[in-house]
Amino acid sequence: MTHRWGMAVDLDRCTGCEACVTACRTENNIRIAGPEQSARGRAIAWIRVERYYEGDFPDVRVKFRPVMCQQCDAAPCEPVCPTYASHHTDEGLNAQVYNRCIGTRYCANACPYSVRFFNFGNPVWDRPLELPLNPDVSVREVGVVEKCTFCVQRINAGKEQAKAENRELKDGEIKPACVQSCPASALVFGDLNDPESEVSRLSRSSRGTKLLEDLGTLPKVTYLQRQF
């Protein structure tokens, strides 16, 4: 059975701690832009935590929402790419082939979620920050666009492990860095083609909504709205 990867985010559980942001940056070799580049809008964060406020002081409530690539089934970033660097895989992922990318930034402009990032410079890590670089993830060069991949390196490793052991993948066996690091278990990842998987069950929840669903992008990230 072909997999179709998706994610569910329980907004009741998210505390806004940004452990997911830190884990994603470490796992995927995301460069640190620094204060000057960040001030110019050149920071890179494959996942961000948005904050919303309700009420008036002192009775103010803060709500958090993690936002990553929504891995849309009708992704507007894909048809605008002239080199097919941004494309759809058989497993429903919006993949980015870095050595095809010529940096037009059409995809970043087409993305309604603002989750694609252009590299304005070559990555530089001052010692000893280069030591924990992940050898399973390529370091992107100046002039290319990058984004969340659902930690495709972990997906591939999990499939290879299951194949070597002559078995099927287990639900919850593959965890992107953001999912693994969340102390509140607010993020769930899995196969949407498996109706019994936890992510499939959550995606069918009456609390489930999609981000900017009215745009017709068919995102595969489901947000479970707050009850409290």
What are these model-derived regions, one by one?
Residues 1-228:
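Non-ligating segments of multi-cofactor redox enzymes
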